[in-house]
């Protein structure tokens, strides 16, 4: 069990938000980046054969995260160290840190992990992050 489902959902949200940000705010072609809509597209044929991984992705498929000012922001994420939550409000989700916080009970949901890393960070424009469903209804997480 590498990642608990809630940690995996948080990682999925960070990856999705990061990719959407750079679709909306492209990096310069001279920098060698090639970010396209195919990078974060839902394709059932590519979903893991592991039922739990598929369920976790589906759980956040129609949810998006934005800054309190309404911007899709650069939600950085890195592996991080095992058995350490890392710094809160850093604007950078630690994959292993999120798994650690879920495992020890410091966070119960993917949304709590996302709030831990992104709320009041420079990345999210200094306020709490917000979550919305596909109908643009704000979710109270």
Give the ranges of each region predicted by the language model:
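Conserved, single-site charged/polar hotspot
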Residues: 1-141
